[in-house]
Amino acid sequence: AELEKSIEGSASKYVLFGIPEDLGAKGNFGIGGTDTLWIPFLQSFFNLQSNDFMDGNEMLMIGHFDFGDLQFLIDTTAKGDDERIEAYRHAVNTIDDEVEKLVKIITAAKKIPVVVGGGHNNSYPLIKGAAKGWHKAGKIPLAQINCINLDAHADYRPMEGRHSGNAFRYAEEDGYLQKYCVIGLHENYIPQNSWVDIVNN
């Protein structure tokens, strides 16, 4: 409630926060590492100058999520690769809920979220939270938004449990993603079934 009041009461246009986690990438049989970006980002970001192009008062920095306890629990209790992958995917649902709540608060206050870190699994709760928040604020008639993904991968794989490779599919299937555009999509990185689904939508 205190964070929500701070966001609503701020004159800032943008709200910055971090999601230093890599559980979605690991749940997609990928290599972790997206959890390490937040601190180096801050070291550079805090050295930016406030000027006519970007006034520091336009940005409210509220901190970052800490999902280290989920990572530790999985690392210390999962037995074997299959159980570990399933646990990562289950943990992504928890991350989704927390990120969606925060983004909904930010957008309902008519502000723009700026997010650093995490995998593309975070695209789903960002889209969902933004659509709900902007709809609540009266900015959009339906809780649906359009999205441009600048990536070599479409991240539109089947709904087989949440991970970094299917965020946009979940967002569309759940009705929060209206139009989806991928810029930089690499032919060698898209399964045929995902390609057909994107072309037909």
Across the structure, where does each feature detected by a protein language model lie?
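Conserved alpha-helical scaffold segments that buttress catalytic/binding sites
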Residues: 1-201
